[in-house]
């Protein structure tokens, strides 16, 4: 009975894995692409983990032009700069980043639904 008592369900945090890999010698630099549900059928795609030497505004400009959506770059205290795009653009963003040569396909993690 004591084994069953110790299994307490906890809340799921979608950003927990991003915070867990702050630094280390053997850690990979992953790019996390997430989708967040807004109101109704509206959704928001976030891209985080790109290298700091890249120009986020130029990447955002190309993404907006390619996918015909609106977006912005948000400065977060914990996560750094995060690109936000309107709509569910997870697959589009991942293929764009790989084709542009910014990220290898193995270093992309797609989260959501």
Swiss-Prot record:
The modification N-acetylserine is found at residue 2. CDD domains: eIF1_SUI1. Residues 1-24 are annotated as: Disordered. One of its GO terms (biological process) is regulation of translation. GO terms for molecular function: mRNA binding; translation initiation factor activity. InterPro entries: SUI1 (IPR001950), SUI1_dom_sf (IPR036877), SUI1_euk (IPR005874). Keywords: Acetylation, Protein biosynthesis, Translation regulation. It comes from the Eukaryota. Gene3D superfamilies: SUI1-like domain (3.30.780.10). GO terms for cellular component: cytosol. PANTHER family: EUKARYOTIC TRANSLATION INITIATION FACTOR SUI1. Probably involved in translation. Belongs to the SUI1 family. This is Protein translation factor SUI1 homolog 1.
